[in-house]
Amino acid sequence: MKKYLLILFVIALAISACTAEEPSASLTGAWKLTGYGPADAQTPAIADVDAGLTFSEDGTVTGNSGCNGLGGVYTVQGDQVTFSEVTSTLMACDDPRMAQEDAVQQVLTDTATFKIEGNTLTLTNNDMVLVLTR
């Protein structure tokens, strides 16, 4: 009897290991910024800069807005990602880069809704939307 219980336990453990990933795990990795702005008026990300975000498994986020480097902490609950302790360098850049910087900073100020479809991540905070790809 104990032998059968052990076999059932191992099978149940194997099945539970095959369940869907948590949303935080799917956020993990590097994402390149491709667009930003209100949902109905997206602006393409500046092509000649390496703007994007990297979500680590340890709950930290790092990246570049196209003007300044940034870092902070994130937590996920359902389809909400909450950013905290976000800091960035304080360089001044030309107007297009500063507009992109402002959009990234606006989304990272608090809690954003996120959606992943294929290789595209959408972060929305109030009226500001960031679109990123893997």
List the model feature ranges, each with a label:
Residues 4-134:
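Lipid interaction determinants
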